[in-house]
Design a protein with these regions (language model features):
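Alpha-helical lid/collar subdomain of P-loop NTPases
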Residues: 1-25, 40, 195-290
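AAA+ P-loop NTPase catalytic core and its hallmark functional loops
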Residues: 1-216, 220
Length: 290
């Protein structure tokens, strides 16, 4: 008799869910592993360079898993506790009262909660507040007192965190400590920029009117600049987000050279009279016209 093949969670996902066209993975198994972890309620952390698609991937995964999407960005606040917990308000008639945050409401439902740029918190409050939310305790204390009211986390709430880690990200911690990492039992995914062919496919899917010639030139430019960045000759790289911006300008009628200059040169300013980085990038841009 033929051996019985046991159907697993991974095989079911691979047989029933198509990889989204609007996002490209270097390896398809990454996508299905993420879906498996969402299905199992295992929080995941995605790291990688700015503009490689971490945040847009969160929205895509929320849609596929039919969860309500909430995003909380920690790069735009100096008070994480107010963003996560809420604020005390005062009204002449009602007196003092507590207004819960969006986060308090989000964790009580079947939601996909994106904790964006967690390494941008320099107060230390973020980790302290979120530890019991992300681990087995599954609760959020509304203040720091011992008898604080708390909110239980819905068993179907899922947490997806993103982090930019590295010297080039202003205000970002160098790394996440071990206690933080241990809370993401679904694993830590290190996204990199896509291989040239897949990045080209992505920008052509996002901008169907873009021709193959210009798509190839855009991703070739990005690869050359990234190689210079990897060799420590530039302090920052060209992101996929920047490639998409260039492609949109080209589709709208701007020349490729002008679109590259308009989008990319502001990331390489002249600093204290030193224009060496800008000159290098301009040279790469000009070579795209050859």
């Amino acid at each position: 008799p033929e051996p019985i093949v046991k159907e697993t969670v991974m095989s079911k996902l691979q047989g029933s869910v198509q990889i989204p066209e609007e996002f490209k993975f270097a390896e398809n198994i990454t996508f299905y592993t993420m879906l498996r972890n969402i299905f199992r309620g295992k929080n995941i952390l995605v790291t990688g360079p700015s503009g490689c698609g971490k945040s847009s991937l969160g929205k895509i995964l929320a849609g596929i898993t039919n969860k309500e999407f909430y995003s909380f960005n920690f790069g735009d606040t100096m008070n994480p506790s107010a963003k996560l917990l809420g604020d005390t308000k005062y009204d002449k008639e009602a007196g003092t009262w507590f207004k819960p945050s969006r986060f308090v409401n989000a964790i009580q439902s079947n939601s996909f909660i994106m904790l964006d740029e967690v390494t941008r918190d320099r107060t230390g409050d973020l980790a302290n507040i979120l530890m019991p939310v992300l681990d087995g305790q599954k609760y959020l204390a509304l203040d720091e007192s011992e008898d604080s009211d708390s909110v239980s986390v819905n068993k179907n709430a899922f947490f997806y965190a993103t982090a930019n880690i590295g010297r080039e990200y202003l205000g970002a911690s160098h790394d996440l400590d071990r206690a933080w990492k241990d809370r993401f039992t679904g694993g830590i995914y290190e996204l990199e920029y896509l291989p040239k062919q897949k990045e080209m496919e992505l920008i052509m899917i996002r901008n169907p009117q873009l021709d193959t010639y210009n798509a190839d030139k855009i991703v070739d430019f990005a690869k050359r600049v990234r190689d210079l960045h990897s060799a420590d000759e530039l302090t920052t790289a060209v992101s996929t987000r920047m490639c998409l911006a260039v492609s949109e300008l080209v589709v709208d009628g701007m020349s490729l050279i002008e679109a590259l200059k308009h989008t990319c040169l502001p990331f390489y300013p002249v600093q204290a009279g030193d224009d060496s980085e800008r000159v290098r990038v301009i040279q790469v841009i000009q070579s795209m016209g050859d």
